[in-house]
Amino acid sequence: MTQMSDEMKRRFDAEVAKYPAEQKQSAVMACLAIVQQEQGWVSAEAENGVAAYLGMPPIAVHEVTTFYNMYNQQPVGQFKLNVCTNLPCQLRNGETALQHLCGKLGVEPYGTTADGVFTVQPSECLGACADAPVLLVNDRQMLSYMSEPRLDELVETLKAAAK
């Protein structure tokens, strides 16, 4: 983030305005989300820009970015597929689902397809243990009971929707 766009600054201002002036650092998560929406990921340079804007030490912003798995710390594909691999999902084929997706798309975990359409990564608990294995698409859409046939169907549907 070499320079903050006027639109990004306007959006940051709107988030900061929700807090008392002496607590503007409370908007850090919202500002990081805005960066990610505009750029697709949160770079170290963007973290420094957010830190400067909010008057925070850069390490404090970096701690937020690295603590929450919703912030992409490297470029990702158009469709980011997070597969839960915590114990309840593991017991119901979560790891198998992850490996199936990776094999189908020809990537390792955390990898992005050569065409930039898919990134596949393991995930911490997504909070739907009874529906295991579960998968989250682009940090927004949760899908349950993701058997291999359902995973194959998802990949084909997303490929058809790719830009």
Q: Where are each of the predicted segments found?
A:
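Signature of N-terminal electron-transfer/Fe-S-associated modules in redox systems
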Residues: 1-163
